[in-house]
């Protein structure tokens, strides 16, 4: 399992969340996404950060290479290609 931290530039937050929670969720599940959590950054309107949990790097790459995913991102109002940072868990610690 891997985690991915994404920075996404988008036009309208409600449009983005609407597509992300429906067509986007379907596409992510198809390609092995286990969960996603969306964050806003104070003072950065037009941008969200997303933390994904994915079954494997290969599954995530399959997601990125799917032409339907690109179309879904465009319909969400995503501007350009999101920036993805792949994270490897080092430790789970309490508190």
Which positions does each model-derived feature cover?
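Short S/T/G/P-rich N-terminal loop/turn motif that feeds into the first structured element of a domain
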Residues: 1-95
């Amino acid at each position: 399992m891997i985690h991915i931290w994404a920075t996404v530039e988008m036009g309208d937050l409600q449009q983005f969340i609407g597509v992300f929670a429906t067509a986007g969720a379907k596409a992510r599940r198809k390609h092995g996404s286990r969960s996603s959590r969306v964050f806003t950054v104070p003072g950065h309107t037009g941008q969200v950060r997303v933390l994904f949990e994915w079954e494997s790097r290969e599954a995530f790459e399959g997601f990125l290479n799917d032409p339907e995913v690109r179309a879904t991102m465009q319909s969400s109002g995503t501007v350009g290609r999101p920036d993805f940072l792949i994270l490897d868990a080092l430790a789970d610690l309490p508190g």
